[in-house]
């Protein structure tokens, strides 16, 4: 029984290849021009990359180099003071 089921499965899996379209048929609705698709994707990626760099360099994110040296973590006031915790 298992041999019959396996052979039926192989037969059913192989049937669509008998009626498959020619991959070089340019009039087929499932024919894709992969080179043009790849070039279009690279152009789109380049434009998005350039836009990202422009946004980063647009001046909205300014770094000030003449700032005072940053404080060490222990120099600030304590965040938890005695009596600030509450019992639930």
UniProtKB/Swiss-Prot annotation:
Glutathionylated. Disulfide bonds: none annotated. One of its GO terms (biological process) is positive regulation of sodium ion export across plasma membrane. The chain crosses the membrane at residues 39-59. Residues 66-88 are annotated as: Disordered. Residues 1-20 form the signal peptide. It holds the Pfam family ATP1G1_PLM_MAT8. It comes from the Eukaryota. Its main location: membrane. Belongs to the FXYD family. Keywords: Cell membrane, Glutathionylation, Ion transport, Membrane, Potassium, Potassium transport, Signal, Sodium, Sodium transport, Sodium/potassium transport, Transmembrane, Transmembrane helix, Transport. GO terms for molecular function: ATPase binding; sodium channel regulator activity. Associates with and regulates the activity of the sodium/potassium-transporting ATPase (NKA) which transports Na(+) out of the cell and K(+) into the cell. Reduces glutathionylation of the NKA beta-1 subunit ATP1B1, thus reversing glutathionylation-mediated inhibition of ATP1B1. Induces a hyperpolarization-activated chloride current when expressed in Xenopus oocytes. It comes from Rattus norvegicus. Residues 21-38 are extracellular. It is a single-pass type I membrane protein. This is FXYD domain-containing ion transport regulator 3. Regulatory subunit of the sodium/potassium-transporting ATPase which is composed of a catalytic alpha subunit, a non-catalytic beta subunit and an additional regulatory subunit. Interacts with catalytic alpha subunit ATP1A1. Also interacts with non-catalytic beta subunit ATP1B1. Interacts with the alpha1-beta1, alpha2-beta1 and alpha3-beta1 NKA isozymes. Residues 60-88 are cytoplasmic. It is found in: Cell membrane. PANTHER family: FXYD DOMAIN-CONTAINING ION TRANSPORT REGULATOR 3 (PTHR14132:SF11), SODIUM/POTASSIUM-TRANSPORTING ATPASE SUBUNIT GAMMA (PTHR14132). The lineage of its organism: Eukaryota, Metazoa, Chordata, Craniata, Vertebrata. The keyword Ion transport applies. Coiled coil: none annotated. The keyword tRNA processing does not apply. One of its GO terms (cellular component) is endoplasmic reticulum membrane.
């Amino acid at each position: 029984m298992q041999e019959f089921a396996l052979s039926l499965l192989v037969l059913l899996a192989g049937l669509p290849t008998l009626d498959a379209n020619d991959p070089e048929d340019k009039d087929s609705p499932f024919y894709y021009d992969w080179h043009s698709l790849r070039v279009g994707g690279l152009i789109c990626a380049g434009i998005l990359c350039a836009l990202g760099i422009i946004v980063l360099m647009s001046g909205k994110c300014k770094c000030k180099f003449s700032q005072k040296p940053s404080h060490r973590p222990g120099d600030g006031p304590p965040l938890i003071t005695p009596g600030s915790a509450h019992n639930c």
